[in-house]
Amino acid sequence: MLRLSRLPLPPVLQRLTGFSLFVWRRAMQNRCLQVAASLTFTTLLSLVPLITITLIVVAAFPVFEELSSQFKEFLLRNLVPDFAGRIISVYLKQFTDNAGRLTAVGLALLAFTSLSLMLTIDRTFNAIWQVQRPRKLLHNMLVYWTVLTLGPLLLGVGISGSAWILNWSGLARTAPGLAGIIQNLGSLTLATVMLTVLYGLVPNCYVPRWHALIGGALTALTLGVAQAGFGLYVEISRTYQFIYGAFATFPFLLIWLQLMWLTVLIGAELTASLSYWKGDVWRREGDSQRRFCDALDTLVRLSQAQVHGRALGQADLRHHIDTGYDEIGRILDELARLGLVQRSAEGLWALLYRPESVSLLRLWHHFVLDLNASPADDAISHSLTELVRPLEAGLDISLAEFLHRYPPAGPAVTLPAVPRPG
């Protein structure tokens, strides 16, 4: 495989290319292509019900009642290309007309269909961020029901505000071209806000706001370009529409939904990977030995904070440890399973024991190699035990003794006083 350093590219482009390949490898490891296909079929079932619920929420407020058609146009324009929007509008009208005759069971199934899409997104995003402790189902249901109700209201405010500004300024009449550009910028801004909220709130872990904003903005811009390019492709491919007529819409719609979800998922991978950009952490090879070193570094920083009666967040740890936020989260979860650290309700972490009571050998056995768990009659394990015995003898020290022998090179952690959890 050709190394990037051998390519005739400037260092900045080499770094960007290498980081992009790192994000793509993560996307492939998380099976984003297959997940995008799954979300595509889920969207086919829930797209019309989801838009219907959104329109019902908007229509419930008289101030937005006159904007319902603009609201529907905005949703269809940003979710699907024009050719599919015309078809979906027909089904949407039929569905909305029949929604008033639904029973309580029917309404519950309608809401469940919409929530199932959100729960699928929740599971996917938590997998991308390597979250091992997902939220409880009831909490998820409450969060996404809030999104279904408050999301349309925020969009309604944005659409009504932009419409009022265009009418008040007279641009819609005097400069329709400029008004169209402003509308497109408004759509891009709203899409950025929605994706930023999605990337920032859905994963059950710490996501820096700037990372969510950068990922949301780049994904929204990519979706806009992809939608324009796909629309151009559909215009060129008139042969399919001539042969298949209205049936040609559905294959194109499937392809677009697959492309849309793949873009959103890769945007999520980018957002989750941005913490690896600082210090070129993405160049490191992740292995058990590296994780052991990061876990030991984590305990060192927590022990420094313990001296001052403080707890640390993931952002504080990332400032001293060269790895990603998701990797820090996994290490903290592993240390919590060992009973060494505890997380507070505020999301801060603290060491539960004095450094004198924390064994490095136990840490080595958990993260790297534990031959004691092998069968007694395993000859290979027995031989390896003899080989690594001197190494384990050197590791059979406490965290306090390690700190005494090898004081940390970085500065001690200094933060505002925060009480340690329980």
From Swiss-Prot:
In the bilayer, the protein is annotated as:
Multi-pass membrane protein
Keyword Hydrolase belongs to the record:
no
Quick one: where is this thing mainly located? membrane
| Record-linked Pfam families | Virul_fac_BrkB
What are the GO cellular component annotations?
Answer: plasma membrane
Q: Which InterPro entries match?
A: UPF0761_bac, Virul_fac_BrkB
Keywords, A to Z, come to: Cell inner membrane, Cell membrane, Membrane, Transmembrane, Transmembrane helix
Localization, per the record, is: Cell inner membrane
Q: Does the keyword Metal-binding apply?
A: no
Q: Where are the transmembrane segments?
A: 44-64, 102-122, 141-161, 178-198, 212-232, 246-266
The similarity comment for this entry is:
Belongs to the UPF0761 family.
According to UniProt, the name of this protein is UPF0761 membrane protein LHK_02978
Name the species this protein comes from.
Answer: Laribacter hongkongensis (strain HLHK9)
